[in-house]
């Protein structure tokens, strides 16, 4: 039985893969997830063994440099002594600057280090840690920014999909009577989405029978509920939830940001989507994620800056009038994911580490 630490933190995009890896490995190994305060918000502590290791946020302000160095050193020492005390043999990092202190401590202790890159462009933290790792797990052979001399470390795996989503896929759901649209702002919510679509949604509701499911930030719930109520649009408004897949299954069409976990879950559940990447994502990784899957004809992609009034109305009107457009996307996704198998994926990953 190996002792494994999975290092993660920050947003759901880093934490969700960590949870999947935990579920793959915990039955035959002793596994712990190390995360920062933000990451703990996405983890059910009754299901996962966790260790909090807070890491200072990188700041461009020169006045923050000395506090950053002190806090970073404390994070490193915390990681080092925890790894040593628990006799950890394998470290898996799911990316982000939060994992750097733990990875450096693991390097000094000469542990096996495995990196995971969920995006189609290599993140800066993973790029920095490449020299120290045994392998880096990705979803593609063609990862942007992966140095040629490091390509031998790239090991392509199937997307890390949560077990509850595997189970949910086979369950039947009651079909909505109206054309159902889900708007996903991501684990952090997308305030821009709350305002970007309003005029078009009002117009759609007056011309077609539609139902809206809208995931937003908890701060904007009240305001958004008021908007839908005042415009007589049938809707369900909610903040971040671990059961989003249950809502996805009910819907005909998804409008979403394009974090790796979200896009992969939509593809697995065979739900056509319109991706609107977060324009300020690091290295524009959301655009590259969306572009990769749109090139496989699973959905559509539009830049937020090019999103004009009346675009969404015309786009969804076309989908409602011509169901074949959605059916073709669903067929393409079905052919892509039909060989996904939870037990097989788990067994394969066990053998890799």
Could you describe each region identified by the protein language model?
Residues 300, 308-340:
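Conserved donor-nucleotide binding/catalytic region of nucleotide-linked donor-dependent transferases
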Residues 19, 34, 39-46, 166-170, ...:
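Donor-nucleotide binding loops and adjacent catalytic segments primarily
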Residues 6-19, 191:
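A short, glycine/small-residue-rich beta-strand->loop->alpha-helix junction that serves as a flexible
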Residues 339-353:
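C-terminal alpha-helical cap of glycosyltransferases
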Residues 6-9, 27-71, 158, 218-220, ...:
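Conserved nucleotide-sugar phosphate-binding/catalytic loop shared by glycosyltransferases and other
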Residues 30, 38, 107-168:
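Active-site-proximal region of nucleotide-activated glycan assembly enzymes
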Residues 61-90, 108:
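An amphipathic, basic-hydrophobic alpha-helix
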Residues 88-90, 233, 249-264, 271-272, ...:
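Acidic donor-binding loop of glycosyltransferase active sites
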């Amino acid at each position: 039985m190996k002792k494994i630490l999975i290092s993660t933190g920050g947003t759901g995009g880093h934490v969700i893969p960590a949870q999947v890896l935990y579920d793959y490995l915990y039955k035959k190994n002793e596994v712990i997830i190390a995360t920062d305060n933000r990451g703990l918000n996405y983890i059910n502590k009754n299901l996962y063994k966790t260790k909090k290791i807070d890491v200072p946020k990188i700041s461009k302000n020169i006045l923050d440099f000395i506090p950053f160095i002190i806090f970073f050193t404390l994070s490193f020492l915390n990681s080092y002594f925890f790894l040593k005390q628990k006799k950890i043999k394998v470290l898996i990092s799911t990316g982000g600057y939060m994992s750097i202190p733990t990875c450096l401590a693991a390097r000094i202790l000469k542990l096996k280090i495995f990196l995971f890159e969920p995006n189609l462009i290599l993140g800066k933290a993973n790029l920095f840690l490449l020299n120290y790792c045994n392998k880096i797990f990705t979803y593609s052979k063609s990862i942007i920014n992966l140095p040629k001399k490091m390509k031998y470390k790239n090991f392509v795996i199937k997307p890390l999909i949560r077990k509850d989503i595997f189970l949910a896929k086979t369950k039947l759901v009651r079909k909505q009577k109206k054309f159902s649209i889900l708007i996903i702002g991501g684990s952090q919510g997308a305030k821009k989405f709350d305002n970007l679509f309003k005029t078009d949604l009002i117009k759609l509701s007056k011309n077609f029978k539609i139902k809206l499911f809208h995931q937003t930030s908890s701060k904007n719930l009240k305001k958004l509920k008021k908007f839908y109520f005042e415009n007589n649009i049938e809707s369900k408004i909610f903040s971040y939830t671990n059961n989003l897949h249950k809502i996805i299954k009910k819907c005909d069409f998804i409008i979403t940001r394009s974090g790796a976990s979200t896009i992969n879950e939509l593809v697995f559940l065979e739900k056509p989507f319109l991706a609107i990447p977060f324009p300020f994502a690091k290295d524009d990784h959301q655009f590259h994620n969306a572009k990769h899957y749109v090139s496989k004809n699973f959905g559509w992609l539009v830049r937020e800056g090019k999103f004009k009034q009346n675009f969404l109305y015309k786009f969804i009107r076309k989908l409602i009038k011509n169901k074949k457009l959605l059916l073709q996307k669903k067929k393409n996704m079905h052919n892509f994911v039909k060989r996904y198998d939870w037990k097989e994926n788990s067994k394969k990953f066990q053998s890799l580490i």
